[in-house]
Amino acid sequence: MSNSKYFQDELTYLRESGSEFAKYHPKLTHFLSEGTFDPDVERLLEGFAFLTGRIREKIDDELPELTQSLMTLLWPHYMRSIPSLCISELKPHTGSVTEKTVVKRGAEMASEQIEGTQCLFRTCYDVDLYPITITNIEQTNSRTSSTIDVTLSTEHGLELSRIGLDTLRLHLYGEIHITRTVFLWLFRYLDYVELDVGGGYKHRLGPEYVKPVGHEEDEALLPYSKNSFAGYRLLQEFFSLPDKFMFFDIKGLKWLKGIPQRSTVKVKFHFKRALPSEVVLKDKHLRLHCTPAVNLFQKDGDPIRLEHRRNEYKVRPQSNTQEHYEVYSIEQVESWSKDERRRKPLIEFESFEHQINQRDKREFYKSKVGERVSGRGLERYISFHTHNGDIADLGTETVLMKLQCSNADLAERLSVGDITYATHKSPTYATFKNITKPTQSVSPQVNGELQWQLIANMSLNYLSLANIDVLKVLLSTYDFHSRVDRQAHRASIHRLDGIVSSEIKPIDRVFRGVSVRGNQFKLVTNSKFFVNEGDMFLMATVLNEFIRLYSSVNSFTELEVFDEATGEVYNWASLIGQQTIL
């Protein structure tokens, strides 16, 4: 039972009504009247209160048997906790990297021990390592414009033309009021980028060579099924780790390959509008070789020895400290027969393969999610079925499982710089450390009204977003952190108050000589309800990606945002699917 309220209510009722009952049955006064408790009777009352509390909780749980099956089939990620997240920085070993070296996403890193357990994180972005460092950042402001000069120098004087520098990814790190503002200036007021290697060698890049990061499928923080729309993932990740989007790529750097004998380049960002006086970019605010990281890793499950007395079994990772782990997902299930001496794969019941070749005697598994008794985190249960849903008779076979796990709420106890230890899946030519504190692990409400809210979202179309209340409910539904963190909850409410109105209207555009009809989504906001104007712009950028869900294959969407506080109008290019068409 995850909610102690039910237990306390039942126990209080038994004690209070017990006194009244004892008045009519004097022989039981010694056991039931207040102030004179028999320890054995007290234990019986507590046990009875626990069981009846579970019954009440079951009555109030709003039919999770229906919602969980549907969610497992369509949106399995909402039956999983959001693991701890952070930003990690990699640094190549001196002399070990002399040209572009890619660290693929999924590289592993371990933390300091907490209660004897190391928390494992894996990277979410590919990281291009170069033998370069940021040696200086200068900012120049005038009344009408600003310039930020970033000086990059190679290690030991290596030539820029020889290190394979084609795309450079930078991370905006530090105070929110600075990073969000610079993000806004990069994608709203950037005039051009100039590469200066000295000696009169200069090259100009347009604003289209600076690209945002974090919207693509291969840049996801959380594993998502192919059945799920990536727009919902973006919303969930935005509320979980907004710094994930504080990255940008500078493309078009192949020009440097034609300039020999240069080891230093100045990357100059020229803006058409002056930065606010309180925004001063320093060396610490721009980082190279960074990536988000998530507390997820592969682990074997405890083998399950099947027995006829049980239909459902708890899924446990192999560990002596079960409380340090939480099962994120079941990746593989096999049964092993001692008599046949072979492994037989079991397929998830919701895969619908049970409807194929029904004559074959195949077994399937179902998983169920519930809250831990402690109320922190989720636990999973597994059962085995035939093709028609009946309980399968697997005899005395043993079930083996491969799991994807997190360290539950253990990882949130880590601090900046605690994730520095290598594993066999870590890069050998670089060191790493987390430059942000890992976030709190957050579990969804698996038994209750949230599941029905999520199912209701499936029926949304672009007309639904024209209702400002529906839009706010949609956004708050995916903000899991605001459900467990009071400060995050207040910030979420304040942010939603800054969304004033929404409107959708059909529009026509000409693309390659052909008239195409789409939908323009107009949003009125007030940046005073956000951290600053840049914070509002970041949320609108994520929303721009999200509304692609409501565009059919032969149509497009277009976002326009009006800020009441400043009078600024922001427009995003028309999108069809995942392609910019105008």
Feature map (PLM): residue ranges:
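C-terminal domain/tail detector
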Residues: 27, 337-582
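Short, low-complexity Pro/Thr/Gly
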Residues: 155-361
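Short, aromatic- and glycine-rich surface loops/edge beta-strands on solvent-exposed regions
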Residues: 107-110, 262-272, 397-404
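Mixed-charge (acidic/basic) macromolecular-recognition segments
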Residues: 1-22, 32, 210, 215-259, ...
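Residues at beta-strand starts and edge strands
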Residues: 84-86, 144-148, 164-166, 189, ...
